[in-house]
């Protein structure tokens, strides 16, 4: 008989870091909302998106999905002992406001909010207007 060996999963257990301050990058498009929380040097601490939480199709672009993504990323960052974040928001999507509120409601202190949406200096032609 072959001896049984204990099997562990292929994932390494992430060491708990002690990161006090960070930056929450909220990327909100018309199709999805991605929340990435980094330390001050720009190294990723936690992230979440509406798609990674199981929302598919047009449900990804809802403010509710962005709210859950913000909560999930903030809770994961708080497990690394993060207390305060500066928020940078990029994009025109419907999940901008609700993701900011969710990060604040999860218990992280917000020190600053900045809009870093790229604005073209008359670059490429934009997509045609939607007919709703």
Swiss-Prot record:
Pfam families: Ribosomal_S11. GO terms for biological process: translation. GO terms for cellular component: ribonucleoprotein complex; ribosome. The keyword ATP-binding does not apply. The keyword Ribosomal protein applies. Keywords: Ribonucleoprotein, Ribosomal protein, RNA-binding, rRNA-binding. GO terms for molecular function: rRNA binding; structural constituent of ribosome. Located on the platform of the 30S subunit, it bridges several disparate RNA helices of the 16S rRNA. Forms part of the Shine-Dalgarno cleft in the 70S ribosome. Part of the 30S ribosomal subunit. Interacts with proteins S7 and S18. Binds to IF-3. Belongs to the universal ribosomal protein uS11 family. This is Small ribosomal subunit protein uS11.
């Amino acid at each position: 008989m072959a001896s049984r060996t204990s099997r562990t999963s292929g994932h390494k257990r992430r060491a708990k870091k002690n990161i006090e301050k960070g930056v929450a990058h909220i990327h909100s498009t018309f199709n999805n909302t991605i929340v990435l929380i980094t330390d001050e040097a720009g190294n990723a601490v936690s992230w979440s998106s509406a798609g990674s939480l199981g929302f598919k199709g047009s449900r990804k672009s809802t403010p509710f999905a962005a709210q859950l993504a913000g909560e999930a990323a903030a809770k994961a960052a708080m497990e690394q002992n993060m207390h305060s974040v500066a928020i940078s928001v990029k994009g025109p999507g419907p999940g901008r406001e609700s993701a900011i509120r969710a990060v604040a409601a999860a218990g992280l202190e917000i020190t600053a909010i900045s809009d870093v949406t790229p604005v073209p200096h008359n670059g490429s032609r934009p997509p045609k207007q939607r007919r709703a």
